[in-house]
Amino acid sequence: MRQHCQSITFADNEYDTLSEPLKIMNFAMKLHYQLLAAQAENTDTLPILLIHGLFGNLDNLGVLARDLNQQHSVIKVDLRNHGLSPRSDEMSYAAMAQDLLTLLDDLQIARAIVIGHSMGGKAAMALTALAPDRIARLVVIDIAPVAYPSRHHDDIFAALTAVSDAGLTQRQQAAQLMRDYLDEEGVIQFLLKSFHQGEWRFNLPVLFANYAAIIGWREVPAWPHPTLFIRGGLSEYVQNSYRDAIARQFPQARAYEVAGTGHWVHAEKPQAVLRAIHRFLGQP
């Protein structure tokens, strides 16, 4: 199995950027979170902030949290319009980053290690522009700091909407209907984790209305600190053609690929992902 860690090599690190620092806004929301104290005694390690992706919640990175919690305090968070966090018509990465910064402030966390998957990875990268000195190290799982040209979730939106329109209340009924729209059983079961008493625990209309912003991206200023990009070998979200964009914004980036995995690489091969994270956190 091909699982390796490598430096991202770039031909030219001279570039111009039109990006500007994100401005601190006043639309921050108080996010729902869970704080897990480090299991090890007398540890002086930095806390880790875990950020889920689109349609997810704070439990989605639980397999990572349980391992990392042995040596680190871990904060699991529901992003706005997800889980038990507040709802809003605003769903920009600037807003998500401000929410995360407010959470760090409320918890009196001066610096943290930030790990985000998919949309959560983009929110984490946006946080580097808003509060560059508050992040010690950054891990981005299967997403790149680019605007994606294609819509990848229209079938998912159709399935979710069909369940809502049908007024279903049981997960088994919802799963049966969703199979008319989706072929991947793993995706269906992932989505159903957010289905409770006939309601989706994410703001489906707002996510649909803001989907262009979610797959879009405004480049952030170069963040010259250790960054790890983990990609699934079968995923199309982090392509070699994105290396220049990564280099401009994260000049200390390293790459780690886990063969035989798709977009949910951390769920498919969690031990490989954890090995990469531990190795990265142990590097100078």
Regions found by a protein language model. Give the residues of each.
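The conserved beta1-alpha1 loop
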Residues: 51-53, 231
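Conserved serine/cysteine hydrolase catalytic core
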Residues: 198-249, 257
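Alpha/beta-hydrolase fold catalytic core
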Residues: 2-49, 69-72, 109-111, 250-254, ...
